């Protein structure tokens, strides 16, 4: 009888914990990027917020160094940008793969900014 009560209490506790830990991520509203994006003013802040933090894409760690002083040259040296077909740029594809941490670390708005910057010629401005 004691085992039954203990099992029942455990089951109720587990169900309570399972259903009380629900988190719904709310995606911020999409804002159309402005024309004439600047690499230093519009793209670098995206990398600073989500890519080159916690030792991810910093100098000496991963293939692409996205720190402000090295990001532009690293993106082109590692063939991450394709201005002829922007949606096939390795950077854009990586951000939209849906399988890894890359897509979860950026918003739809940030990905749209990066795509537009590539479409505008991926200038170092």
Predicted regions and their residues:
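Sec-dependent bacterial lipoprotein signal peptides
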Residues: 1-21
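Aromatic- and Gly/Pro-enriched helix-to-coil junctions and flexible linker segments
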Residues: 21-125
